[in-house]
């Protein structure tokens, strides 16, 4: 079987040396992979329990249209999300188009003119800069008289508690905590660290809303931020919780008032959650959530595999190969434009869709420099499917994530290494 497998990898373009190096790394990671599988099993049981508690039935998959009144599948799914993630209520809709939309919705519905938004973990995603008004944009929070302040993490990645205390004012209404690193190389926040930060903030101002941007973090650990005091948790269905099956959508889970505010902003005052047809995608939302713990486990294995390989080749990787994992993203700093692009070409070449396409840097909306993206995905923009991207500027860091199966993630990493090896950008001869 091993010989047959190696021949199949060779057929896909993986050389004998690259394959041997990958097999060596995989053997070293067996114990860590077993721990990931154990966490996935726990989270799988959690999802099943939530579905059974809420009596999910075949009728939940019926298609609704028009206003979407009395959409049983939609309403049941939102109760499943609330129970699964530990919230009082949930908003899970195909009308929420992406993660940025979900975050903007949560912010704009729970802030009012004169309020202040605080980020105690530094700069948010580039795409949120225009939502907040850091970069001027139509309809931003700043246009509505909502101010913003941020406190950067310390150089070692720890919280600047003194700075945070001084940044909390009488009009600080909402604190946004970005769990994942985004296009940065700071540490991703564990649920435990998020809990300690929320406790600190609530001790200073108990009525402040603590919102966690949970993108890329769902099912990575055995609990979610709502379990440690968050009031609201936000994410995208074309990331972890959609399990690779949801074709669109986002969610907001948390305190009932926060979720209701978001629902009235998404639709209209007086309508809220009562309208919004599921339009035939609801079954994929259920099935994707059901598969999500297993899919996330494969993505985690791929991230650790990538970290171990590229760390051994001398590159800086964040997290490193031994650190605990709190999201599915793996950053690799290449310090070289050609190496970064070659990596992305390898990820694209391993895709089941558009494998023949060569990714090129381009001026992506929402970013201040060219971005390169590799994503031969079934769902456009899906970050739980095998993908890699990054801003093409120093330190030329590429952000790798996803893989609907561990085996596909493995192929992607080996293909990325193959591209670098063919161009003499790495030397693996002594490591095989």
Provide a role label for each language-model segment.
Residues 2-26, 30, 37, 47-53, ...:
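Conserved PLP-enzyme active-site core in the AAT-like
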Residues 60, 64-65, 91-94, 328-333:
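Short glycine-rich or small-residue beta-strand-to-loop segments that form or flank ligand, phosphate
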Residues 311-431:
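Conserved C-terminal alpha-helix-loop-beta "cap" of PLP-dependent enzymes
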């Amino acid at each position: 079987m091993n010989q047959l497998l190696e021949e199949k990898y060779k057929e896909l373009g993986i050389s004998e040396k690259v394959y041997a190096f990958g097999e060596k790394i995989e053997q070293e990671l067996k114990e860590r992979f077993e721990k990931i599988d154990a966490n996935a099993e726990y989270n799988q049981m959690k999802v099943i329990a939530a579905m059974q508690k809420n009596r999910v039935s075949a009728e939940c998959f019926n298609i609704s249209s028009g206003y979407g009144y009395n959409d049983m599948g939609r309403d049941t799914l939102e109760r499943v999300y609330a129970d699964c993630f530990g919230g009082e209520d949930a908003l899970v809709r195909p009308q929420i188009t992406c993660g940025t939309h979900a975050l903007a919705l949560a912010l704009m519905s729970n802030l009012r003119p004169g309020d202040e938004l605080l980020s105690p973990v530094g700069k948010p995603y580039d795409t949120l800069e225009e939502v907040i008004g850091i970069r001027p944009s139509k309809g931003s929070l700043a246009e509505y008289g909502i101010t913003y302040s941020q406190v950067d993490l310390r150089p070692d990645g720890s919280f600047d508690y003194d700075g945070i205390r001084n940044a909390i004012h009488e009009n600080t209404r909402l604190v946004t905590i970005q769990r994942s690193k985004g296009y940065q190389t700071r540490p991703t926040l564990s649920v435990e660290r998020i809990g300690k930060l929320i406790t600190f903030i609530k001790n200073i101002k108990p009525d402040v809303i603590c919102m966690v941007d949970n993108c890329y973090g769902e099912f990575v650990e055995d609990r979610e931020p709502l379990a440690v005091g968050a009031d609201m948790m936000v994410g995208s269905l074309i990331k972890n919780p959609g399990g690779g099956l949801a074709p669109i959508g986002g969610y907001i889970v948390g305190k009932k008032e926060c979720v209701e505010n978001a629902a009235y902003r998404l639709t209209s005052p007086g309508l809220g959650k009562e309208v919004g047809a599921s339009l035939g995608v609801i079954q994929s939302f259920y099935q994707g959530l059901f598969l999500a713990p297993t899919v996330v486990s494969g993505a985690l294995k791929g991230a650790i595999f990538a970290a171990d390989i590229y760390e051994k080749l001398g590159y800086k990787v964040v997290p490193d190969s031994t650190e605990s994992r709190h999201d599915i993203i793996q950053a690799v700093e290449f310090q070289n434009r050609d190496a970064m692009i070659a990596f992305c070409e390898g990820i694209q070449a391993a895709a089941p869709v558009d494998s023949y396409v060569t990714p090129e840097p381009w001026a992506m909306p929402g970013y201040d420099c060219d971005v390169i993206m590799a994503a031969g995905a079934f769902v456009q923009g899906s970050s739980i499917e095998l993908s890699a991207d990054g801003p093409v500027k120093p330190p030329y860091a590429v952000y790798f994530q996803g893989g609907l199966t561990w085996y596909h993630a493995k192929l992607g990493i080996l293909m990325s290494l193959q591209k670098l090896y063919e161009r003499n950008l790495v030397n693996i001869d002594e490591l095989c």
